[in-house]
Amino acid sequence: MTEEKKFSSSNRPARKQAVPERKELPASQRRHAAKLTDGTNSSAGTTPRSNKPARQGQSQGQGQNRHTNSSRSNTQGGNASRPNQSKSQGQGGRNNQRPGSRTQASEGRPMIREKKNWSTKPREGQIDYSKKTDNSLKQYVSENEKRKQAAAAKTTKKPAEQSKKAAEKPAQTKPKTAETKTTATTTQSGTGKFGGALASGNNSARNNSRKRNTNGTGQQTPRRNDKPRGSKKSRRIAAKKGPAVPATERKEQPLPAVLEYRIGMNVQDLSKLLHRDTAEIIKKLFLLGIVTNQNQSLDADTIEILAADYGIESQLKEEEDVADIDKFFEDDTIDESKLVARPPVVTIMGHVDHGKTTLLDYLRNSNVTEGEAGGITQHIGAYQTQLNGKTITFLDTPGHAAFTEMRARGANVTDLTILVVAADDGVMPQTIEAINHAKAAETPIIVAVNKIDKPGANPDEVMNQLMAYDLVPEEYGGDTIFVKISAKFGQNVDELLEMILLQAEVLELKANPDVPARGSVIEARLDKGRGPVATVLVQQGTMRVGDPIVVGNTYGRVRTMTNERGIELAEALPATPVQITGINEVPQAGDRFIVMADEKTARAAGEERAKRAQEAIRNSGSVVTLDTLFSTMSEKAMKTVPVIVKADVQGSVEALSGSLKKIEVDGVRVDIIHTAVGAINESDVTLASASGAIIIGFNVRSTPLAKSQADSDKVDIRFYNVIYNAIDDVEAAMKGQLEPVFEEKVIGNVTVKELFKFSKVGIIAGAMVEEGKITKDSKVRIMRDNVVVYDGEVASLQRGKDSVNEVKMGYEFGFTVAKYNDIRVGDTVEAYIMEEVKVK
């Protein structure tokens, strides 16, 4: 057999075309067409007509035409003859006489363009399909099927990864292999696509073979699942990951016998208790007529209905009140077996300028006094110092009367009280107040008689004065320790520290560092960069960075923790003062704090405490009884001075507010409508504008937007850094709120010299100032024959063509009077102003 070669698109034989049925020609035309056909074939070098009879069911003419088309389609380039040449000849050869046509050879003339031998002889290894034999066509079909099978084998070649998957799932690959073999067998037997078409000679089979998704039987070919899908990158990533692991089915846990719930649980909490998905619980509640989400709190009735629908019992779990943090400070909650010694907490108290801050400055080797406005401590500071390896914690409280609450707060968290009394000044009102606070807190008192270095110092006189308040020195048989010191030069300061440590040993101060930290807020403020900052004193336990904490009516998580020198600490032991950040709002000075187990519990406790505080405020002002009705009405009849107080720290806010409320002016009281820590903002200005309040800023400034808004709304903002000045200004404003007394003051006399009438303006009076002056803002009294005819205001004041605000004596001017045109020449005008008489 001749060597077979693959057919390309250029040498592949054309598909058999459908030849329409032709009518029988007359005998004369058939003879003429036969001569033309013989001549053309001989000149073109084609194979002579076959003398074989036509197939059964076909006419002679049809067989000739099909043979002619078949032989011409195999010629390279298709230039030897046209496909429908025989048809043209059969119709009479109307195109045979065209110049340059190849059919000119039938007239005996050589072909004009006959330069090559247009032979249809097949090439080496090529099958001659010009011969109309069934074997050659079957051989073509067989070769075509072999090529298709080879191409399919290349396409279905699988990589190593796909071979592994195919080995894992043999059930999916076997039907494909069987289907391929069946198709190949059918094709070889001549009943496939081409075999069926050639055997039957039906043209519709060829059309069916062109459908991509159908096989020879007309059924749709199944999709090839083994073909790689996706981009090359995605297949490469999938190959690295390996075969997908099938997901395991989730085993549903059984329902609990009893659902123990608490008030405020949401769907997420219930899903953990019921071992069910949140979507299932939400769907079940929806079917029960309750629309909710997974974060919404549910009441007791809803939870009980859900438990009944699941067929289980429900029981309310009684839990302790997490919002009540005061119970953690009770003595019965402390385990005495785990107590260890702790440093003493000492509060320094005394009158103004008696040297408390100077003493503390010497102890901690820092300069605090120079930074305080007016040389007075403005808020509590907490510091630590060491002596002979032992630590002492000091709390510095202001001595001014405005800071009464802060001194009381300091006494409540302290172990010892250092009462500083100036030797040259003696006992003062704040000294007595400090003694009372220390006695109320039941804390021992150590008296430090300061300023013994001054010439007029008399320490013995101070000791005698304090004996009247049950502070008897040990020299006189009492139990009160007296130490004579000079804080400025450090004289006898070490002796004072030794007395403190000695007294601490007597008190046996201990704490448990293993419990959750708890303590008190010494000071709090709002920092621009760090947010709310609180100075706290740890009284029990150990505080660490990251602990969830409840502080007063707010909560948070300890983000940073620093000591008085700004050094960051990882933990704070008992009796250690630290500054913490991370709380949501600025707490009140004196609030208690406690570290919770988790942030969720801390948040619940803080929100509940804030809610209770708001309810207490609303209830305190809403109840009116017959006993309080008259007093309430009296208060509403009183004049008030609304004030908004903003300060840098909470202690200053409380001190300034308390001092303002104590100002006594008959018939007037101060109404503090808002207090806060931080800069004065737009909200404060808006509130002041709506209520007519004065804004007092203590050691704070206003934002640029607040300043511009205050200018436009004409809101009075006052800034202070010394509390005395703020109190004096507010007291003056309160005195101004009383009914003012005005007196009339004549500032000038004017005589009308001439009148000028204008239709648009009216009458303009030309006059001269005889005495004093006249201003545009002054009032005028027009007198005619010493009788007042009109009393009103100046509408306009001019000199020449220019408007002026004032005209002095000896000058001429023109003026008009508001709402009055009956002025006459010779009238005398008296200019005057109303001047307020200050209340003494």
From Swiss-Prot:
Annotated spans, G3: 396-399
Domain of life per record: Bacteria
Main location: cytoplasm
HAMAP family (UniProt xref): IF_2_B
Region (G2) residue spans: 375-379
Name listed for the protein in its UniProt record: Translation initiation factor IF-2
Region (Disordered): 1-251
Domain tr-type G positions: 341-510
Organism: Leuconostoc citreum (strain KM20)
Subcellular location: Cytoplasm
GO terms under cellular component: cytosol
PROSITE patterns, per database record: G_TR_2 (PS51722)
Region described as G1: 350-357
UniProt keywords, alphabetically: Cytoplasm, GTP-binding, Initiation factor, Nucleotide-binding, Protein biosynthesis
Binding of GTP, residues: 350-357, 396-400, 450-453
Region (G4): 450-453
Compositional bias (Polar residues): 38-50, 65-83
Highest classification ranks of the organism: Bacteria, Bacillati, Bacillota, Bacilli, Lactobacillales
Family to which the UniProt record says this protein belongs: Belongs to the TRAFAC class translation factor GTPase superfamily. Classic translation factor GTPase family. IF-2 subfamily.
